[in-house]
A protein has these predicted regions:
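N-terminal "arm"/small-domain region of PLP-dependent enzymes with the aminotransferase-like
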Residues: 1-62
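PLP-dependent aminotransferase-like
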Residues: 19-21, 103-183, 187-192
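Conserved donor sugar-nucleotide recognition element shared by glycan-biosynthetic enzymes
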Residues: 64, 68, 90-94, 119-120, ...
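Phosphate-binding glycine-rich loop
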Residues: 66-112, 126-130, 136
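Acidic/histidine-rich catalytic cores of soluble enzymes
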Residues: 195
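Active-site "gating" loop of Rossmann-like NAD(P)-dependent oxidoreductase/epimerase domains
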Residues: 198
C-alpha cells in the first residue's frame, strides 16, 4: 500500500470518527448565556491533516524541514520581508524576539520594557526571562488597549522599548505609540499573535 493510500485511509477514518472538516477541537453545542465563547483553539481542514500525515509517514520533521521552509518563504513574501523564523508557539516567538533585540541593541539586565497590564503572560515572561524589567501601563476601557497618555508617563532613562500586544485583536492607537517611541528613541516591539496581518 502506498503512502498516499495510507493517508487517504487515515483521512477517511478521522472524518468518520470526528465528522467533516474543518474541525474545531473545542466544538460543543453552544448555549447562549451559558456556554463559554472560545475565540481560539486548534482548527484545521484536510490540507493541514494531509501535510501532517505526509510529514510523519515520509520521515520529515515538522519542527524544521521542507514544509516549514516553504511556509517561511511564503510568509516572508506575503509580508515583504527577506526572511522569517517559524517557531512552535507565540510564546517562543516572543522569547526569541526579546533575546535577539537585547543582543542587537545592547540592552542591559534591569533595562525596562513597557507593557500593558492586560494581556498574556507570554508578553511579560520573555522580558523577565531575559533579565529585563516589565513596566506596566493601565488600559482604557473602550478597547482594553493602552492608556496612551500613561505610556509616555512611564518612560524613564532605563526604558528600551514598548511591547505591544493588541488585546483580542483590537487595534491600539499605533500612530500615537509609534510617535512616542520615535521621540524617545526606544523600540516598538509587537506581539501580533492575535492580530497578524491586520
Amino acid at each position: 500500500m502506498s503512502i498516499d493510500n495510507i493517508i487517504s485511509d487515515l483521512l477517511e477514518k478521522v472524518q468518520c470518527e470526528e465528522g467533516a472538516f474543518p474541525y474545531m477541537v473545542n466544538k460543543r453545542e453552544f448555549i447562549p448565556g451559558e456556554s463559554p465563547v472560545y475565540y481560539s483553539g486548534p482548527y484545521w481542514d484536510n490540507n493541514e491533516i494531509e501535510v501532517i500525515f505526509k510529514s510523519f509517514l515520509k520521515g520529515k520533521w515538522l519542527a524544521s524541514g521542507e514544509e516549514v521552509n516553504k511556509f517561511e518563504r511564503k510568509f516572508s513574501k506575503k509580508f515583504g520581508k527577506a526572511s522569517s523564523l517559524m517557531v512552535n508557539s507565540g510564546s517562543s516567538a516572543n522569547l526569541v524576539m526579546i533575546a535577539a533585540l537585547k543582543k542587537k541593541f545592547g540592552w542591559q539586565d534591569g533595562d525596562e520594557i513597557i507593557v500593558s497590564c492586560v494581556g498574556f503572560p507570554t508578553t511579560i515572561a520573555p522580558i523577565v526571562q531575559n533579565g529585563l524589567k516589565p513596566v506596566f501601563v493601565d488600559i482604557n476601557f473602550t478597547d482594553l488597549n493602552w492608556d496612551v497618555d500613561e505610556v509616555e508617563e512611564k518612560i524613564s532613562t532605563k526604558t528600551r522599548g514598548v511591547f505591544s500586544s493588541p488585546v483580542l485583536g483590537n487595534p491600539y492607537d499605533f500612530d500615537a505609540i509609534l510617535d512616542i517611541c520615535e521621540r524617545y528613541k526606544i523600540q516598538l516591539i509587537s506581539d501580533n499573535c492575535d492580530s497578524l496581518g491586520s
